[in-house]
């Protein structure tokens, strides 16, 4: 591997950038805490045991191997960490001066309650702007409130369009299937996903699809490629 003048490894060049959803590194004494994958503890409890230096060093390690960093992104771990810890991860990642701009999930987990689609829009914009101010690219996380309230296709389009219009690009969308989160069953009803992706292709540069549906993902890749997404 080549090295820079400072002695740091030069990331290899690849035709595509692969993003690694890096997890956090915990201090050894977390082993003694009563926890499991399903019940890792409250965000405040978890924060006491995060080894922040090792967590950031892991991101530098991945960057050195040519990976982009998807920060505060792995859905299950993100929501276990809570927004306060996620925000610290995002800002700390932004201070690493990585080879590639990192991406990070923008959602509404900082809000105690959501009463309307307008609350959703404001919440996502708030987090997305923090990500952008930190030097990252927002990935709009799926919004559980929409399927929980039986939102129709046009509501999805209106919510996402309002978020997209309020932000600078580039942006990405995340579509998480019900296999990973049953409460998201029926997400993006009708043709809403493709209509949203077509709203402003110059801003919406792509999507992360976690659907376990290879046929649909092939179809989506072909359709989006026509808009250089």
Regions found by a protein language model. Name each.
Residues 3, 10-12:
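Polar/charged low-complexity regulatory segments
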Residues 3-5, 193:
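Residue-level detector of functional hotspots within protein domains
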Residues 5-6, 25:
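Charged, compositionally biased N-terminal leader segments and the immediate start
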Residues 168-229:
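Catalytic alpha/beta core domains of metabolic enzymes, predominantly
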